[in-house]
């Protein structure tokens, strides 16, 4: 019988950070994850963009969020002897007059994050992009190496016997008054971090969830500067793995798989 404070289902970004913070507070955890080849976390671009939407609004509480995010990624990286976060400006190319005017408005308002680009930067972009409206620069912005983060944290959990590599069976879960029982595991609490898989579990199957799907293209773009990220409307381009680029994402409400 294994006894822990918290049973965590799923080791994506959410499950990884919840287990990290709980362990830092001295709690004992067991993470159950069957390591699917594809998941929302594993295919995420890792871009942190401080502005959003057609009107290029500054994200609510972004200064506090950026401080927390950068500090946390650096702390986890230090613990695991890895670097998970890098600062990379975003060149945003307005695809429409509406987006162009929205960006110009933010610059005139002296928005903290949106700036004009230099002639040299404009010439650099023209080597790979065709554009009618002048691009702007979003800074600071950040890129997270999500794949490295997940694999490194998985190794850490395995090292300290905090990971069970298996599929979670909801039917084997028993909720007692003072504990959680799952197979040969007793826990004080259970936290579900396995995304879409929870939708079919009894407690939540009747809730009005909206399931969405995004697809991204992984492409080789020789000559494109990996020191930056790029954006045009809803399309983002970010450095990926092995000299490739992540291009996406679609946003689908109806799909078969």
Give residue spans per PLM region.
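Helix-loop-beta segment of a Rossmann-like dinucleotide-binding subdomain
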Residues: 54, 82-91, 119-155, 164-167, ...
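Beta1/beta-strand and adjacent pyrophosphate-binding region of the FAD-binding site
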Residues: 2-12
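Conserved dinucleotide-binding and phosphotransfer motif residues
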Residues: 25-27, 159-160
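Short beta-strand/turn micro-motifs composed of small residues
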Residues: 10, 33, 94
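Conserved hydrophobic helix-helix packing surfaces used for dimerization/oligomerization
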Residues: 6-8, 29, 245
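Dinucleotide-binding Rossmann-like beta1-alpha1 core, especially the glycine-rich loop
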Residues: 47-127, 131-132
């Amino acid at each position: 019988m294994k006894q822990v404070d918290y049973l965590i289902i799923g080791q994506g970004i959410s499950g990884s950070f919840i287990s990290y913070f709980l362990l830092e507070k001295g709690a004992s955890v067991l993470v159950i994850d069957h390591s699917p080849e594809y998941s929302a976390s594993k295919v995420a671009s890792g871009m942190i963009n401080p502005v959003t939407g057609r009107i290029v609004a500054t994200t609510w509480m972004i200064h506090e969020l950026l401080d927390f995010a950068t500090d946390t990624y650096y702390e986890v990286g230090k613990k695991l002897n890895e670097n998970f976060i890098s600062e990379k400006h975003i060149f945003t190319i307005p695809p429409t007059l509406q987006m162009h005017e929205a960006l110009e408005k933010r610059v005139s308002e002296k928005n903290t994050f949106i700036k004009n680009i230099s002639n040299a930067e404009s010439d650099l972009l023209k080597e790979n992009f065709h554009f009618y409206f002048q691009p702007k620069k979003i800074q600071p912005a950040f890129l997270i190496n999500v794949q490295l983060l997940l694999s490194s944290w998985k190794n850490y959990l395995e090292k300290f016997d905090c990971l069970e590599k298996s599929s979670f069976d909801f039917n084997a879960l028993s909720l007692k008054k003072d504990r959680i029982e799952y197979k040969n595991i007793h826990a004080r609490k259970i936290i579900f971090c396995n995304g879409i898989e929870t939708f079919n579990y009894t407690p939540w199957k009747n809730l009005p969830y909206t399931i969405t799907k995004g697809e991204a293209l992984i492409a080789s773009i020789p000559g494109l500067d990996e020191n930056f990220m790029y954006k045009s409307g809803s399309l983002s381009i970010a450095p990926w793995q092995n000299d490739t680029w992540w291009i996406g994402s679609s946003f689908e409400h109806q799909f078969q798989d």
